[in-house]
C-alpha cells in the first residue's frame, strides 16, 4: 500500500521545475517544499490550489490516486 499522499516531486520533474523554483514562486522556505516532496508533511488545501495554478495542473494531478480513492470511501 502506498503511503505517499502527494505527487509533487513527480509533477515538478514532469514540468522540469525544481524545488527551489517552487519555493520562490510560493515564497516559502526551501525545507518546506522539500518536506512536501518527500511526503513527510503536506501542503494545506489553499497551498495545494496555488501549486496547481503555478504548475498548470489539476489538483488531482498533485495527489496520489490511491489516496483520492480512500477519501471517496
Locate the predicted segments by residue.
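Short, charged recognition helix plus adjacent turn
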Residues: 2, 10, 15-16, 35, ...
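The alpha-helix within a helix-turn-helix
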Residues: 12, 23, 52
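Helix-turn-helix DNA-binding elements, focusing on the entry/boundary residues of the two helices
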Residues: 19, 30, 45-48
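Recognition helix of helix-turn-helix/homeodomain-like DNA-binding domains
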Residues: 28-43
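DNA major-groove recognition helix of helix-turn-helix/homeodomain DNA-binding modules
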Residues: 46-61
Amino acid at each position: 500500500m502506498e503511503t505517499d499522499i502527494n505527487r509533487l516531486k513527480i509533477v515538478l520533474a514532469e514540468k522540469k521545475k525544481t524545488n527551489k523554483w517552487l519555493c520562490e514562486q510560493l515564497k516559502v522556505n526551501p525545507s518546506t517544499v522539500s518536506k512536501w516532496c518527500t511526503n513527510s508533511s503536506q501542503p494545506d488545501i489553499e497551498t495545494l490550489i496555488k501549486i496547481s495554478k503555478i504548475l498548470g495542473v489539476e489538483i488531482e494531478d498533485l495527489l496520489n490516486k490511491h489516496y483520492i480513492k480512500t477519501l471517496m470511501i
